[in-house]
């Protein structure tokens, strides 16, 4: 019967440990990159605001550009319907 000390030294176990460590380190590195990118995006929005642009409108445009044309048209139709129902158009 293998002891826990013997299991620690088995090549397959060491490989699994190394692989797990590599995965964790990759995730940590990507999380740091994600934070850096988020900071950069925040800086661009701050720059836009400083130049007089409406940040809320910019965020809406960025979100809309991610949608395909059909999805965007459907949402615009729904919004227009709701605005008409509320007497806002």
Swiss-Prot record:
InterPro entries: GapR-like (IPR018753), GapR-like_DNA-bd (IPR046367). GO terms for molecular function: DNA binding. Belongs to the UPF0335 family. This is UPF0335 protein RPE_4107.
